[in-house]
């Protein structure tokens, strides 16, 4: 009986893995691209293993998932494969009218995903938070500045305006530009993240005040299961 109860604790982790496997197989078959099977199987495997380790009381379980998934998306997908997985990449593929790369990523992790697992993206997979969580202010030392939350909407609007402008002006070599925007955008995110962390004595100050992705995350998180 005790062993059955122990196994039941890991059911959510197994369900999470199976959910990503379902996405992996569906995209692999519908888009006839093996990459989707490997990509989502890897991410789902890391998330399933990490949450299982967390359930088992392993101290660094969440950090393991952050590094495994965040580094993969930043270095392999972003730098090596030259896919802009930032919000600008989402607008880019959306305006092209294709459902791949950043549009799939945003649909799964940031638009519909939060209905199932809330802000799991922020805690387990975000490559910006992955680095910021190494800073010394794990417990916020100052009250939250609610009014500064409007800055995330400014950032959201600026990213939309930037990519819209590039399309409207019919700028050449957009794919290459999006890659450089990915590199520059991440550098700016990290710089802003460090500055805000030290100003507000809070590792996640950037996430609370500047991150434009929260505009997508908040609606689904309110109704999260």
Give residue ranges: language-model regions.
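Non-ligating segments of multi-cofactor redox enzymes
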Residues: 1-225
């Amino acid at each position: 009986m005790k062993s059955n109860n122990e196994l039941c604790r890991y059911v959510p982790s197994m369900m999470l893995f199976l959910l990503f496997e379902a996405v992996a197989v569906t995209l692999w078959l519908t888009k006839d691209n093996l990459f989707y099977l490997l990509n989502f199987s890897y991410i789902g495997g890391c998330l399933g293993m990490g949450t299982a380790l967390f359930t088992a009381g392993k101290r660094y379980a969440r950090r393991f998932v952050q590094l495994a998934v965040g580094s993969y998306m930043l270095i392999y997908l972003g730098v090596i494969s030259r896919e802009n997985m930032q919000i600008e990449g989402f607008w880019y593929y959306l305006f092209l009218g294709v459902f791949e790369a950043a549009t799939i990523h945003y649909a799964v992790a940031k638009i519909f995903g939060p209905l199932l697992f809330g802000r799991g993206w922020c805690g387990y997979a975000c490559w910006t938070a992955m680095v910021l969580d190494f800073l010394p202010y794990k417990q916020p030392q100052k009250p939250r500045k609610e009014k500064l939350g409007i800055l995330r909407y400014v950032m959201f609007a600026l990213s939309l305006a930037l990519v819209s402008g590039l399309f409207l002006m019919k700028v050449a070599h957009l794919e290459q530009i999006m890659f450089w925007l990915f590199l520059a955008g991440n550098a700016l995110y990290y710089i802003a993240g460090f500055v805000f962390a030290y100003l507000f004595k809070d590792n996640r100050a950037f996430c609370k005040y500047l991150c434009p992705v929260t505009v997508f995350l908040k609606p689904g998180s309110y109704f999260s299961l």
